[in-house]
């Protein structure tokens, strides 16, 4: 049996299928992998959380980076992989998407149950009162004033609602992701070459509870040896092939 057909059968039979996505899903929309380079090939250096808190200069650099990335997102959109996942959810074949991506493309494609373990670049959060703002409007304010804005509710520090290096994940978000993984009977990992803590434990948690694990990634991953099926192919093309068997 063709491997794509096998996964389609597993997906058809699953009652609690969950997908975990990483940067590889978004690179097929032309969005750079944030861990390495920007869209022009320049090396980027992320601002760590403790440095953000301590340095006004670092906060300015952080806002420049994130607002530049948000601008790049305006030239991108959901790709075939995002769209098919949204269709599978709408058809009742997929319970949720857990993602390490901060671009919000799953929601733009139509997915409604999305757990963003690293947050979203599309919102700004006050680190004091937790008030949220639209990132587009706040980036426009930042670029016009050439100054990092403060919270108009309490005067606190404002930061894009993403998880920076050294910043703790939101406990309720991690709890939701863990619960979904442990309850899954099929767990698909898409575009994640290097899962980072604590997200790297989710496929193992799913597998320990009896779930089949499927990996789709262009490069080899540390999970390949224990997965039930592995595809080193384009994510969009792989999901399209699986979807073809679902339509039969």
What are these regions (language model features)?
Residues 1-248:
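Conserved catalytic core of sirtuin-type NAD+-dependent deacylases
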């Amino acid at each position: 049996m063709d491997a794509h057909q096998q996964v389609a059968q597993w997906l058809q039979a699953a009652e609690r299928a969950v997908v975990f996505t990483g940067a590889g899903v978004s690179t097929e929309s032309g969005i750079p992998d944030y861990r390495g380079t920007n869209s022009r090939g320049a090396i980027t250096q992320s601002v760590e959380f403790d440095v953000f808190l301590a340095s006004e200069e670092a906060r300015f650099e952080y806002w420049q980076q994130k607002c530049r990335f948000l601008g790049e997102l305006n030239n991108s959109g959901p790709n075939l992989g995002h769209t098919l996942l949204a269709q599978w959810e709408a058809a009742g074949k997929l319970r949720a998407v857990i993602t390490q991506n901060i671009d919000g493309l799953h929601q733009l494609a139509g997915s409604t149950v999305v757990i963003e373990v690293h947050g979203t670049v599309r919102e700004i959060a006050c680190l004091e009162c937790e008030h949220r703002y639209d990132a587009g409007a706040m980036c426009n304010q930042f670029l016009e004033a050439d100054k990092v804005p403060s919270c108009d509710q309490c005067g606190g520090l404002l930061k894009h609602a993403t998880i920076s290096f050294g910043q703790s994940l939101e406990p309720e978000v991690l709890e939701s992701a863990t619960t979904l993984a442990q309850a899954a009977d099929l767990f698909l990992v898409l575009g994640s070459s290097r899962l980072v803590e604590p997200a790297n434990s989710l496929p193992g948690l799913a597998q320990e509870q009896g779930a089949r694990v499927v990996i789709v990634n262009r490069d080899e991953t540390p999970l390949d040896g224990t997965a039930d099926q592995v595809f080193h192919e384009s994510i969009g093309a792989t999901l399209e092939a699986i979807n073809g068997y679902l339509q039969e």
